[in-house]
């Protein structure tokens, strides 16, 4: 059994609830424990994971959030930089599943967040589990 921290950027409550539920269900189905930490936005997710990874309390992480395109360039910055930050941490050997949705509209986000549909929260948790298994295999 491993301990996972689900780090959520809580902005769209109803969508986050679904993503977290999917992630938690996927982790618990494999016998893992999950705790949830909320941060203000998607740009804060990588930093929160980096801080939490420092103490070794958690074996893996699931990043959760929803970024919906608006009328400004802000979408590109938030979507790209949050993904870049998560990827950088993953390249440093931290097991992270990225479940931060980047969509054109709320309808697309709902389709992806709903555990009964595309279940991207569950998929992100499964990715984190897979990376944790790779850590074990390669002794990372």
Swiss-Prot record:
Keywords: Riboflavin biosynthesis, Transferase. It holds the Pfam family DMRL_synthase. GO terms for cellular component: cytosol; riboflavin synthase complex. The active site is at residue 74. One of its GO terms (biological process) is riboflavin biosynthetic process. It is an enzyme of class 2 (transferase). It catalyses: (2S)-2-hydroxy-3-oxobutyl phosphate + 5-amino-6-(D-ribitylamino)uracil = 6,7-dimethyl-8-(1-D-ribityl)lumazine + phosphate + 2 H2O + H(+). Disulfide bonds: none annotated. 5-amino-6-(D-ribitylamino)uracil binds at residues 11, 42-44, 66-68, 98. One of its GO terms (molecular function) is 6,7-dimethyl-8-ribityllumazine synthase activity. InterPro entries: LS (IPR034964), LS/RS (IPR002180), LS/RS_sf (IPR036467). (2S)-2-hydroxy-3-oxobutyl phosphate binds at residues 71-72, 112. Its EC number is 2.5.1.78. Pathway: Cofactor biosynthesis; riboflavin biosynthesis; riboflavin from 2-hydroxy-3-oxobutyl phosphate and 5-amino-6-(D-ribitylamino)uracil: step 1/2. NCBIfam families: lumazine-synth. Catalyzes the formation of 6,7-dimethyl-8-ribityllumazine by condensation of 5-amino-6-(D-ribitylamino)uracil with 3,4-dihydroxy-2-butanone 4-phosphate. This is the penultimate step in the biosynthesis of riboflavin. HAMAP family: Lumazine_synth. Belongs to the DMRL synthase family. This is 6,7-dimethyl-8-ribityllumazine synthase. It comes from Erythrobacter litoralis (strain HTCC2594).
């Amino acid at each position: 059994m491993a301990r996972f921290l689900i780090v959520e950027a809580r902005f769209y409550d109803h969508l986050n609830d679904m993503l977290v539920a999917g992630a938690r269900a996927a982790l618990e189905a494999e016998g893992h424990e999950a705790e949830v930490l909320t941060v203000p936005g998607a740009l804060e997710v990588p930093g929160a994971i980096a801080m939490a990874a420092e103490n070794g309390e958690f074996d893996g992480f699931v990043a959760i959030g929803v970024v919906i395109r608006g009328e400004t360039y802000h979408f590109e910055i938030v979507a790209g930089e949050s993904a870049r930050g998560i990827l950088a941490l993953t390249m440093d050997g931290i097991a992270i599943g990225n479940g931060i949705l980047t969509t054109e509209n709320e309808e697309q986000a709902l389709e992806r967040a709903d555990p009964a549909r595309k279940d991207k929260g569950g998929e992100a948790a499964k990715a984190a589990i897979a990376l944790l298994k790779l850590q074990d295999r390669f002794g990372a």
